[in-house]
């Protein structure tokens, strides 16, 4: 009876997975020791995208069954999708012992090792996976994972080349430009990092979110602070100031927009003679002082600037107010202590 019902189930497996699933559940009630049902359940759950249940069914089957190449492939993929990268890697290795040329298993070996941060093994797996460049089954994400392995190994030029291959394969994935920007930033090649980030922002279908804007502004700020690009510092500072102003306007209860505008304008006024950063440090401080968990170093920076600003303006009482605030936050702060001694 079970055998004939399994045949009927096979007819509906691809047409109506839910019907197939219902039949298998009834079969399992009738024959709970028939391990074939666990495997079939795993296949149906996999088809339906219910990966957690498919994983459980495969685990039940593999306890007593003899896995095939397809079993290893699907189970390793399920484990990967469930973020169980170590076990997925183990299954991929076992599957490759059975089927050394299995394309999906070779892919998973590379993907899993990246997630496990085993970059040496990952690069070896990538070399195996890409050993047949004419294979038509590569997808853009394969090049992304390879690029990230190379980036982790500090092979930055080759990483960018692989990210470029991913984009060439599928230009719709403009988020890859952000990866490229990150690589250039690590190399401190800020002009290229900024160009790539602009491409990332330009490829968005909607408006960029606050974190994307903030990171773009910060990238311009870092470029402005790098001595290699001092000829372009005014341009980078102007762009950073514009972006951080947008951040401050979009999230007025968050200190970051004003705080980074303060840093930008402090660079524009290195002697603090104009007080360009003053209104932004004040705005950031007014927000931070309402937060019990505010970062100490950020509070110290805001108060330090304002203390020094009033010192330059010879408003010593106001200057002392800010230096004393620092000592309330950080009693051992040497800069504040020396500043107060100097005012006396």
What are these regions (language model features)?
Residues 1-8:
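Short, small-residue-biased leader/transition segments that mark boundaries at the very start
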Residues 4, 40-44, 74-78, 108-111, ...:
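Canonical tetratricopeptide repeat
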Residues 4, 37, 71, 105, ...:
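TPR alpha-solenoid repeat register
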Residues 9-10, 43, 77, 111, ...:
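Residue-level recognition of tetratricopeptide repeat
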Residues 13-14, 47-48, 81-82, 115-116, ...:
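Register position in tetratricopeptide repeats
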Residues 26-27, 60-61, 94-95, 128-132, ...:
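Canonical positions in the second alpha-helix
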Residues 32, 66-67, 100, 134-137, ...:
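Short coil turns that delineate tetratricopeptide repeat
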């Amino acid at each position: 009876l079970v055998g004939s019902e399994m045949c009927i189930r096979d007819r509906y497996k691809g047409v109506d997975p839910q019907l197939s699933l219902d039949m298998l559940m009834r079969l399992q009630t009738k024959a709970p020791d028939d391990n074939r049902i666990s495997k079939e359940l795993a296949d149906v759950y996999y088809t339906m995208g219910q990966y957690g249940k498919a994983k459980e069914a495969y685990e039940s089957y593999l306890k007593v069954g003899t896995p095939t190449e397809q079993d290893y492939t699907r189970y390793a993929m399920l484990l990967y999708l469930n973020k169980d990268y170590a076990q997925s890697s183990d299954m991929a290795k076992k599957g490759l012992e059975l089927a050394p040329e299995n394309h999906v298993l070779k892919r998973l070996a590379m993907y899993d090792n990246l997630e496990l941060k085993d970059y040496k093994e990952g690069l070896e797996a990538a070399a195996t996976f890409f050993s047949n460049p004419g294979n038509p089954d590569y997808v853009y994400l394969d090049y992304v994972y390879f690029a990230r392995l190379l980036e982790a190994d500090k092979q930055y030029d080759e990483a960018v080349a692989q990210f470029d291959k991913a984009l060439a394969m599928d230009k719709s994935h403009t988020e890859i430009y952000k990866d490229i920007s990150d690589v250039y930033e690590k190399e401190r090649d800020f002009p290229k990092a900024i160009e790539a980030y602009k491409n990332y922002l330009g490829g968005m279908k909607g408006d960029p979110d606050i974190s994307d804007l903030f990171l773009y502004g910060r990238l311009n700020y870092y470029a402005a602070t790098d001595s290699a690009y001092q000829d372009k510092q005014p341009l980078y500072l102007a762009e950073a100031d514009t972006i951080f102003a947008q951040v401050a306007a979009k999230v007025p209860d968050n200190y970051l927009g004003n705080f980074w505008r303060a840093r930008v304008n402090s660079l524009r006024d290195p002697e603090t003679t104009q007080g360009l950063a003053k209104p932004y440090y004040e705005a950031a401080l007014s927000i931070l002082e309402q937060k019990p968990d505010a970062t100490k170093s950020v509070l110290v920076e805001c108060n330090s600037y304002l203390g020094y600003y009033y010192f330059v303006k010879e408003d010593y009482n106001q200057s002392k107010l800010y230096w004393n605030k620092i000592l309330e936050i950080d009693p051992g702060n040497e800069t504040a202590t020396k500043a107060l001694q100097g005012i006396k």
